[in-house]
Design a protein with these regions (language model features):
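Bacterial N-terminal signal peptides
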Residues: 7-18
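Beta-strand-rich recognition/accessory modules
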Residues: 267-346
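Positively charged n-region of N-terminal signal peptides that target proteins for export
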Residues: 1-6
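Extended, loop-rich substrate-binding clefts of extracytoplasmic carbohydrate-active enzymes
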Residues: 93-168
Length: 346
């Protein structure tokens, strides 16, 4: 299986193309491996993440993602399953961007698990090329296409990733511009979107019911069990809402806090005031999905205005989001980050 091969080779020594330079926040290094269709990202010679662009994945993802201290914040399943993980939602891989209703097609839920007879209901994001690597600015620029199951291109996607590290904080900015390639491309409100992160077990909320997980040998348990060992994630948003109640609420930022193996880690997801329908609706779930959706509308909040965006051929729409990974971050620290993100010129 091609995607499994990509992961197995992930930690091997790379004899591949690399670019590095001193950035404002540290030395960013990109190592591109064209054979295995990936770009590894390092800061100060310490691993950060990998951009995976195999078209077997139905979309491009950043996976896995590590803290400064070397702890993985992403779920391993389905590419690299770990003991005691959940195996739900195989389309949740690392950090990604897509949506649940584009001209009636579901891009969000597509994965290798979808049966061939149902594939016509789903869309895929196909990689085209790496446009540019600029290590001095921590930038990776990519080109992709949103297509239907027959290969018809609905949207052209130009994405810029900006990777940085400062004072123990790692960040990923994603700026995605979508251009219509059809007479009309319609985004209809849907809860499944828009930028998503599937987190490690430590960041989940403790479960109240027995469930099936992978055992120590990587096999699914025969009998449901209640296992909350090491599980202690807590969400909070800019308005002070906590826990599972953040879901469906509009907020300019949502933070997820947990203790993983004795280290306090906070993951923060930021919306940008230039985005449509700012601030975005939270699509954060206790089982480990951490997402922010600018196009959710009534799909998550019946009192919200309806959301429907139509792009004529050649028209564009741009989304800007940021992920910050740090220690025990206070609300005031996060507010300052949000303000800086909104002030930054793109």
């Amino acid at each position: 299986m091609k995607t499994l091969k990509i992961f197995i080779l992930h930690f091997l020594a790379l004899s591949c193309f690399s670019v590095n330079a001193a950035s404002i926040d540290g030395q960013v290094t990109f190592k591109q491996d064209k054979i295995n269709q990936k770009v590894d990202v390092f800061i100060d010679n310490k691993y950060f993440t990998t951009y995976l662009y195999s078209n077997d994945l139905e979309k491009q993802v950043l996976f896995p993602i590590f803290t400064v201290s070397g702890k993985d914040i992403t779920r391993g399943f389905p590419l690299a399953p770990r003991p005691f993980e959940r195996t739900d939602h195989p389309h949740h891989i690392g950090l990604w961007f897509n949506f649940g209703d584009v001209n009636g097609l579901d891009f969000w839920n597509n994965s290798l698990a979808i049966k061939p007879e149902n594939k016509h209901k789903y869309g895929s994001i196909k990689f085209i090329k790496i446009k540019n690597i600029n290590a001095s600015k921590g930038k990776l620029q990519t080109l992709a296409a949103w297509i239907d199951n027959d290969g018809k291109k609905l949207l052209e996607e130009n994405t810029t990733f900006i990777f940085s590290e400062n004072n123990g904080l790692r960040s990923i900015e994603r700026i995605t511009q979508l251009t219509s390639k059809q007479k009309e491309v319609i985004f209809t409100e849907n809860k499944e979107g828009l930028i998503g992160l599937r987190v490690d077990r430590a960041f989940e909320e403790p479960s109240q019911k027995a469930e099936r997980y992978l055992d120590s040998n990587g096999n699914m348990t025969e009998t449901p069990v209640l296992n909350n060992e090491g599980v202690n994630g807590v969400y909070r948003n800019a308005e002070g809402v906590t826990g599972s109640d953040v879901w469906g609420k509009k907020s300019k930022w949502v933070a997820l806090h947990a203790d993983k193996n004795g280290e306090i880690i906070t993951i923060v997801m930021f919306d940008n005031e230039k985005n449509p329908n700012y601030p975005a609706w939270s699509h954060a779930r206790g089982y480990g999905l951490f997402a922010m959706n600018n196009l959710a509308g009534k799909a998550v909040d019946k009192d919200s205005p309806s959301v429907k965006i139509t792009l004529k051929k050649g028209e564009k729409i741009t989304f800007r989001h940021k992920i910050v990974i740090g220690g025990d971050l206070s609300d005031s620290q996060i507010e300052n980050m949000a303000n800086n993100f909104n002030r930054r010129k793109k």
